[in-house]
Amino acid sequence: MQLKSLQNFFKNGLLGYYPNEEIDTFFYRICSMHLKLKRIDISIKSEMIIPNHTFEYFEMVIERLLNYEPIQ
């Protein structure tokens, strides 16, 4: 899966629960913590292939956010 697809998956998973701006903030924060990517890197490397374990991590984060657990 490409980074851009992961971003779309993440956003679609949280739409209706959080505002778009907050979803973007969550995504950038998680990418910073888990992938060591800055916001600009996400734009530049949008075609980057994401390993399955990273996708699974983002799925878990979505589930936790749907339960309104804070990101730490």
Regions found by a protein language model. Name each.
Residues 1-35, 39-42:
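Non-catalytic accessory regions of SAM-dependent methyltransferases
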Residues 32-72:
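Conserved AdoMet
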